[in-house]
Amino acid sequence: MATHHTLWMGLVLLGLLGGLQAAPEAQVSVQPNFQPDKFLGRWFSAGLASNSSWLQEKKAALSMCKSVVAPATDGGLNLTSTFLRKNQCETRTMLLQPGESLGSYSYGSPHWGSTYSVSVVETDYDHYALLYSQGSKGPGEDFRMATLYSRTQTPRAELKEKFSAFCKAQGFTEDSIVFLPQTDKCMTEQ
């Protein structure tokens, strides 16, 4: 149980990276002319979709978390997320290493010993970002996750609709798409 919760937190930190759904591995595009400097700053995890069974098991207990994106020295991004866990605020940082193109990154999971690809699929920099992560936790355990980030804790309805449509296009089912409820815990500047 704690292991699955830890994985979720590590992945949601970038809105990122379990029970499989039958769907082909999706090829997703990356935001054209991605501008990392405009992507920096505070984001809130507003929505998740995953083919992992832990999402179904944990979705009732999940809530929005705050993430801050900062530049890393290697040209990548540091994604620091603060979330509520066991009635305490916990903070974790993920290093997203630069990939083959701007907006494409990789994340090495210390928990699973695996590397996941993370793509900024679409963003307007001011309101929302759609991210898509994929990789493998082990033989036969392909992992896929989509994350909706919002600059506010109350994303507009059309952003939620856009996220749902994107997720369905990637083969996620309706019950694997979750919009995270707002919380006032762990959201203040630290």
Curated annotation (Swiss-Prot):
Its EC number is 5.3.99.2. Keywords: Cytoplasm, Disulfide bond, Endoplasmic reticulum, Fatty acid biosynthesis, Fatty acid metabolism, Glycoprotein, Golgi apparatus, Isomerase, Lipid biosynthesis, Lipid metabolism, Mast cell degranulation, Membrane, Nucleus, Prostaglandin biosynthesis, Prostaglandin metabolism, Secreted, Signal, Transport. Disulfide bonds join 89-186. Residues 1-22 form the signal peptide. One of its GO terms (cellular component) is extracellular region. Gene3D superfamilies: 2.40.128.20. It is found in: Rough endoplasmic reticulum; Nucleus membrane; Golgi apparatus; Cytoplasm, Perinuclear region. The active site is at 65 (nucleophile). It catalyses: prostaglandin H2 = prostaglandin D2. InterPro entries: Calycin (IPR012674), Lipocalin (IPR002345), Lipocalin_CS (IPR022272), Lipocln_cytosolic_FA-bd_dom (IPR000566). SUPFAM superfamilies: Lipocalins. One of its GO terms (molecular function) is retinoid binding. GO terms for biological process: mast cell degranulation; prostaglandin biosynthetic process. Catalyzes the conversion of PGH2 to PGD2, a prostaglandin involved in smooth muscle contraction/relaxation and a potent inhibitor of platelet aggregation. Involved in a variety of CNS functions, such as sedation, NREM sleep and PGE2-induced allodynia, and may have an anti-apoptotic role in oligodendrocytes. Binds small non-substrate lipophilic molecules, including biliverdin, bilirubin, retinal, retinoic acid and thyroid hormone, and may act as a scavenger for harmful hydrophobic molecules and as a secretory retinoid and thyroid hormone transporter. Forms a beta-barrel structure that accommodates hydrophobic ligands in its interior. This is Prostaglandin-H2 D-isomerase. The lineage of its organism: Eukaryota, Metazoa, Chordata, Craniata, Vertebrata.
